[in-house]
Amino acid sequence: MNRSEKPQLRATTVLGVIRNGKAALGSDGQMTLGNTVIKHSTKKIRRIQHANLITGFAGATADAVTLLDRFDEKLQAFGGQLERSAVELARDWRTDKYLRRLEAMLAVVSADKALIISGTGDVIEPEDGIVAIGSGSMYALSAARALIRYTDLSAREIVTESLKIAADICIYTNDHIVVEEV
């Protein structure tokens, strides 16, 4: 890396699954700066009690925490309406001079909805009830789809096993897995 390049912060695989009226969201704990693992147990999952939701983030931690706080404010302002709050956050994120510089993505699950919220104004509700963000997201997503299709595992078990598979493949994902359930 030459002096003019900033080391790229890489971290996170976050995966959420809805199955049989239950939702689980989990993440690994690894944070990497450049080619170096700097932390093994980063907390990337947050439960929003008053709305019965679980959120997870990928990207810069300070940016993500700022966005999670804003999302919580939107949920309170809109009476816990998940989709409306997500759209309003995405709108603010895209148009606000300060917020649009934030580099993070959010994954949100409730017992019946799963959303990905991005800084480009996207609010994505996957058709299969699986959300995945971060460095190892495509590995975890692939594993989760296979486990849903070919097993009777619970949402929590699918998230856990899929994150383990991602950790075996992605160098930016570890096996210090935290899973929450609603």
Curated annotation (Swiss-Prot):
TM stretches of this protein: none
Keywords, comma-separated and alphabetical: Allosteric enzyme, Cytoplasm, Hydrolase, Metal-binding, Protease, Sodium, Threonine protease
A GO molecular function held by the record: threonine-type endopeptidase activity
Coiled-coil ranges from the UniProt annotation: none
Predominant localisation class: cytoplasm
InterPro entries referenced in this protein's UniProt entry, alphabetically: ATP-dep_Prtase_HsIV_su (IPR022281), Ntn_hydrolases_N (IPR029055), Proteasome_sua/b (IPR001353), Proteasome_suB-type (IPR023333)
GO cellular component, one term: proteasome core complex
UniProt xrefs under Pfam families: Proteasome
First-tier enzyme category under EC: hydrolase
One of the protein's GO biological processes: proteolysis involved in protein catabolic process
The enzyme's E.C. designation: 3.4.25.2
Regulation: Allosterically activated by HslU binding.
Alphabetical list of Gene3D superfamilies matching this protein: Glutamine Phosphoribosylpyrophosphate, subunit 1, domain 1
Cytoplasm keyword on record: yes
Subunit structure: A double ring-shaped homohexamer of HslV is capped on each side by a ring-shaped HslU homohexamer. The assembly of the HslU/HslV complex is dependent on binding of ATP.
PANTHER family in UniProt: ATP-DEPENDENT PROTEASE SUBUNIT HSLV, METALLOPROTEASE TLDD
Similarity field: Belongs to the peptidase T1B family. HslV subfamily.
Function field: Protease subunit of a proteasome-like degradation complex believed to be a general protein degrading machinery.
Name of the molecule in the record: ATP-dependent protease subunit HslV
Gene this chain is encoded by: hslV
